[in-house]
């Protein structure tokens, strides 16, 4: 009985069990010619997150970043990093858990992914690339709104069919 009371008093729990690089890639398809041109890049960042339950209260979250730099029409470099983490999360409501997996965990992983990308770009002898911080809370809120809007539209479409 005392154990149950202790567990209830502990409340929400969040532990990082492991942070690791799941996949990494760096390509310079137009080298060495790209190094001989004036450097005026257009940099595009794509990011995605996904999570899966490994066991009770243990989740893997993967943050995927793809950075593409084009110099004119040519791709200067393409860098992809999948930064992952294993998180033990307990004592949260379903909504809180979704927020943790969709925003908080990616926020923990982002500095690792940013450092990996910066290192790869530097090793490719390109000028330093500093990725700006990402507001994962805002991205998650936008995702939730889109899902709610899609759910609201679905019954209307069924009624019209």
Curated annotation (Swiss-Prot):
Q: Could you tell me which InterPro entries the record lists for this protein?
A: SecB, SecB-like_sf
The UniProt transmembrane annotation reads none
| Function of the protein | One of the proteins required for the normal export of preproteins out of the cell cytoplasm. It is a molecular chaperone that binds to a subset of precursor proteins, maintaining them in a translocation-competent state. It also specifically binds to its receptor SecA.
Q: Identify this protein by name.
A: Protein-export protein SecB
* Annotated NCBIfam families: PRK05751.1-4, secB
User: Which family does the record claim for this protein?
Assistant: Belongs to the SecB family.
Q: Which GO terms describe its molecular function?
A: unfolded protein binding
In terms of Pfam families, this protein maps to: SecB
Give the GO cellular component terms, alphabetically.
cytoplasm
- Origin organism of this chain? Shewanella halifaxensis (strain HAW-EB4)
The record describes its quaternary structure and partners as: Homotetramer, a dimer of dimers. One homotetramer interacts with 1 SecA dimer.
Which UniProt keywords are present, listed alphabetically?
Answer: Chaperone, Cytoplasm, Protein transport, Translocation, Transport
Q: Which GO terms describe its biological process?
A: protein folding; protein tetramerization; protein transport
The organism's taxonomic lineage, starting at the top: Bacteria, Pseudomonadati, Pseudomonadota, Gammaproteobacteria, Alteromonadales
Q: State the compartments where it is located.
A: Cytoplasm
